[in-house]
Amino acid sequence: MIKFNSRVQKLLYFLMNGELSMKNKKSNTILIIQGVLFIILIIGAAYAYLGTFNINLNNNVAVNINSTSPGNLSFIASSTQLNLQVPDTSMAQYNANNNVAAAEDTGFVDITLTGAEGFLTTCSYDLVYEYNTNSDIYGKTVPVTTGATKEITIEVNGMNGNNHFATETNFNFDTSKGWSNATSSKGAKVTLVTGATLKSLGSEQSVRWKVIGRYYNLDLNQYALSGKSFTGKIYVENVNCSSEDGTTVKKGYETILANNGGAASMTTLTSTDFAKVTTASDKGMYKAPDDLGTSYYFRGAVDNNWVKYGKYTKDMYNCNNGTISATDTGNSCTKIASSGDDIYWRIIRINGDNSIRMIYSGVTAPTESTKVIKTEDTSLGNSQFNANSVKAEYVGYMFTVGQQHGTGTDSTIKTYLDNWYANYTDLNKTGTKITDQIYCNDRTSSTSDVAYSTTNYKTLTSWNSTGTQYYYGAYGRIAKDNNPMLTCAVDSDRFTVNKINSKGNGALNYPIGLITIDELEMAGNNFSESNTIEINTSYYLHTGVNYWAGSPHEFRDGVIAREFDVYGDGYLYYDYVGYGNGVRGVVSLSSESKLLGSGTYNDVYTVN
């Protein structure tokens, strides 16, 4: 049993099972498992107070349904627990802070839909909050803060719908916000999210809603709240599902092209275009050759390249020693994700074989304010590129000492990404839509500081691990010539799991890699070797934090290996490989994948 000090009332903790309902309409069989998410808030102090903000729901809900009749589907709503407890020291008025929450915690509402094979099933639903009938109602019978001052707040993050709490908002009763008065059977109620949707082409589709509760210790007399209890529940209602023919839904790459004007409208850019960064109005899709055909890539301030695919299978922490763990090891660990969190991506480009290349973009859904630039929750944590930096080979995603293009040993960052992919996500599950693809780690080199050409960078007659200055291929293309390429110069640097159309080194354990500096420049940034730093904070790959690219820069003075990266200030640069930078994995969806949605922040692509 949890014990509290004299200033704290005990936490009321309880759990209620959901209710099961069956509905039959024409040929549709709809199985709906409806969960309830409980909130309990106990007040116990004069000035700032101790709050227990508790959300509970049975999450052991399971169902198997054979979808044989047209339109058969299962719709499941379940959740975990949010438990916000404020330490006694945070209650004192001398600790008041109107900007930083004294405590916060997050609960989850998980929605799962499985439709019938061959049919496009669409379910809409609302997410509502209802006070218990015997509870106090915050903001109706007791005073609340006014204006922008935050006290007891709710923030709701999810994939789509009209979300009234997408930004943190005081959770006070206010009929202008849509609150309804209590009745004899129901407490006061407000709709948090209206018209959220989930679609399925026969595969299981799900979305996680995050409900964040926060308590602010105010420099105000809050005696009127002392001893009050605010309890309620959050649940799904107004579930409406329909089915239609799903056989005409386009493949994913076709959908992307159609949503961006079609392949025929896309042009090829030149070094003149790449010599400058994009502006906020400079955006779209363009084309360029890659190793497998014609690639179509996003550039500039695009906001329609969002994808939700995959989930975390366990909690994940990034610790100060550059490792990841399922628990907080105490080594200055930062939590990256919770088990069950959705994974969001940004599409970089359609590859030449029509697979879809994407870069990791966190576990929170985009909002209107983050639809182009998302500056939080975009990295898998920090890692060195390689723990060692004193040999030329250490610029490699894999390397063999004594060889220019070796693949005998994994780099530090490859080990990090492989561990994440295989052990912390469901991306490696049977039936995954992730497919093999070429990830270029261009180690062609020159001993001269010259622009890139095959002659200049592919004709070394000897190789030295130390003592010789090397400039790598990406340096010659980007720094000297503003001529990025999506082709990879030699097969030994085309990192793949298996051969793809007779190309690739087959050295990878898992189909995951890093973005190249060429892709970053084509997306809208620019690297210049002049003293003038080009800054772009308006294109979709800007995150406000440093992260690695997978392109070698140079072996400086014959003693230190350097790799390209992106700086949080908005410019492309480089660091020695032993430095700790952000990690953003890159994967590719199969060319057979189908995407539902439009890719915008409130209609994110989902993968079928």
Segments from the language model and where they lie:
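C-terminal, structured domain-capping segment
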Residues: 105-123, 128-134, 188-244
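Short, Lys/Arg-enriched N-terminal segments with co-localized hydrophobic residues
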Residues: 2-3, 7-21
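Short, polar/proline-rich extracytoplasmic segments that appear immediately after membrane translocation
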Residues: 15-98, 224-245, 598-601
